[in-house]
Amino acid sequence: MFAHNNTEIDYFKIACANALMVKKNLNVPVTLITDSGTADWGKSALGKDFVDSCFDNIIEVNRDWMFKNTRNFSDTSYSTKSLQFYNCGHGAAYELSPYDETLLIDSDYTIMSSALSKCWDSKYDVMINHKIFSPLDAKPYTQNVDELSITLYWATVIYFRRSDLARHLFSLVEDIQLNYGYYRDLYCFSSSMFRNDTAFSIAIHMLNGFNSEEPIISELPIVGLLMSWDRDDIYCINDINDITLYTEKVKQSGTYILTRLKDTDVHIMNKWAISRHIDRIIELYKEITCQEAT
């Protein structure tokens, strides 16, 4: 997991909550990659003992203060803010990971099931999804990087093992980040904001011989990534692995459907929504992990 705080969003605390969920549902060690400022803030605010209970390793990397990457963050359809989005380290995950097999998970992809346990001992060296869906979608679908560009792969969850394929993929992602303007022109997408999703999509396309047919990279052994968009909200955390969302209706801004998810992983993209319920999540999963430890 990566966590780099900005002026308003405490990614470190979100990562702590998700680490407890990982330990409960996947029962594997968790390593956090962060910067010293974020780590110092997290340990001061939450307590070193609690932080140590969440993570087996914390790897501190230098934060590139010259990296400027601004994006709009929404808290439902009623509030949007422009904030710094420090997401430039994923390409280094291959070298930084202390494991032979790694699940690279965004801190806000909440692990509420054991579904990703199917990844271990896979015959594939790398797995990453291009299929996504929301609670209101009848079936998963695929997007493109831009209207006339290549298939979009989501770097929200990536499985990889030590292998030449994985090493080449992550090395390419680092090169794409360094030369993002060139690749933006080459692949005909308009946004100048750096996205790991875009960088991995380009790298996969290149490794596949600049071809989208018969991709060299397999998808994760799940139906698709379940997305709760930043226009949605959280109604309540009912219990362990049990959440109820306000899911905004398509093309009906501000109109919601209550959606209950149980034993289902979900990418919660409204960071303020998860922050409003973070203490409840920590309380529930901290208690259950302590019980299981004894």
What are these regions (language model features)?
Residues 39-97:
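Active-site-proximal specificity loops/subdomain of glycosyltransferases
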Residues 22, 94, 158, 200:
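A residue-level signal for conserved active-site and pocket-lining positions in enzyme catalytic cores
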Residues 29-37, 60:
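Short beta-strand/loop segment that forms part of the nucleotide-sugar
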Residues 26, 53-54, 98, 122:
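Short, structured coil segments at secondary-structure junctions
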Residues 129-149, 287, 291:
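A short, conserved beta-to-alpha structural element at the edge of catalytic cores
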Residues 21-28:
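Short, acidic, metal-binding catalytic loop of nucleotide-sugar glycosyltransferases
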Residues 1-3, 11-17, 32, 40, ...:
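A glycosyltransferase accessory/donor-loop signature
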Residues 86-136:
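GT-A fold catalytic core of metal-dependent nucleotide-sugar glycosyltransferases
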